[in-house]
């Protein structure tokens, strides 16, 4: 193996890696030894010295050593094994809920045990629940760790101990195999070498300050952060350069349909809408594909902007596809577009994952023949069996739910006769500038920074759950006396559609009992699309007074008569999501209210979050605060997409570096194309195939 580059050495060449483990590691994108070395610890534990048991404080993670005094199994509400150890300074109780006979036998009275875990204050003094422990041999001195212990991001079935053993082998290979130095010499001068940085971060010596690692300031981290941010920026430059090599259908001015639609509208577009439409039309007139992100706050009128862009393509006899993240939102878009386009003689088609059989086949045929000019749906519209007929524009609503890879896959799908479609991406989640510079560097950006006239700002209050009855009375008053409608949103911390649906059903039953004079509807993610649509339609038509819902109504639902929103457990959601939910009210001229019904006690972070919402209705201000409180991954929807997910860099912490990184990335892109390509391959392997398009 000597002399090989580590990106060419598969993990299967390491001891202990068989087919089953290989498959599990592949789930976290670990395929080669280089991947493993770049899979860096999330945090570190200090197991390099012993704590006297008598000095343990609650909440401290510590290593202790003691002699087993007793070990007992009890059978109460659940089986439990407790083992007490003493080091002379105090007694520690170790508690285990998952255990076996071998564990019980190993913890015999008189044995010496080394244990690591979080100290808690228990009924009988200090205790640890499920500590990691090791029975000591006859050595008089305990075998302590020589370096800080790394804790890695992992996946089901891969233990920390496994990752540590594999990383030990990978670090040994650094002596015989090379990990290629990709930074040009003028950039890497005076910096730690890559092998040095990797050794330091995987096995930090006990002398190293943990605070440096926690703040991302250690030279080893700075070395890798620079490389990763460069790779990210280089991939965006490659995407842009790639896009410039593609051909798109140039769609010149042809305004007859647009003018007809504008004349039929009961309102005039805002100045911001008109400006953004002009920017889009300028892009679409070129023979390279448009790649434009339109940011607009909740209720700023992005749908009309999308419709006007679509008409430019339809006027040239081309097709337009609009993709939304949920069936509910896609269906609402389809209804909106039908209302606007039917009088113009334009047929709007609708495709969703749940469509089956003949209906789906008929829709696919209508798309393939070109009979349907505007296609609306979820990601189902980009499945293999859907064939377009001259697709010239792709509109993606709510970008964060898709991510860069899906965005690029759409391009490939849309390519026909050598032409790529223009792309328009719309998001109602305003993105702070630093974040947009990195995460969306491949896109041009337009901002709709003006709300339509006649919108009244929503008043937001935070009220503890103990006053639930008062809030129910407030709902009764709004619906019966004021003739308004209301939303009651249930949120759950677990990302489980089933549990969320059950919580919503329980709340629905409770509110039907408490408010017998109201018609109360229910909508959640586990209902069939047709059922959801039926409930939403009756709410929109005013047949229901109150709608109990999960966060499925977060985006796009438009009922101007709804003026009151209750959000339960708002402390469980991020600011951007709360702002989205709140945006479902305040869509008419009447004063609207949002009640954040929280459970006490509130954490400090939750207090700050709710205060931000009470103070501001501006999505951009809220997004900046959200970034400061939560960090970029959550803000960009990393949970769903993997977009903007960094191994060492942190866009919030490292934002000061971004302008300089962009300058360096341009330098490498122009002067060192081979290194640029290799850096992207190293840090962002999934993006590589698009960069070469």
Swiss-Prot record:
Disruption phenotype: Significantly reduced survival of cells expressing DNA ADP-ribosyl transferase (darT) mutant G49D. It is an enzyme of class 5 (isomerase). PROSITE patterns: HELICASE_ATP_BIND_1, HELICASE_CTER. One of its GO terms (molecular function) is DNA binding. One of its GO terms (biological process) is DNA recombination. Residues 283-448 form the Helicase ATP-binding domain. A motif (DEAH box) lies at residues 397-400. Coiled coil: none annotated. Plays a critical role in recombination and DNA repair. Helps process Holliday junction intermediates to mature products by catalyzing branch migration. Has replication fork regression activity, unwinds stalled or blocked replication forks to make a HJ that can be resolved. Has a DNA unwinding activity characteristic of a DNA helicase with 3'-5' polarity. Plays a role in recovery after DNA ADP-ribosylation. Belongs to the helicase family. RecG subfamily. Monomer. This is ATP-dependent DNA helicase RecG. The gene is recG.
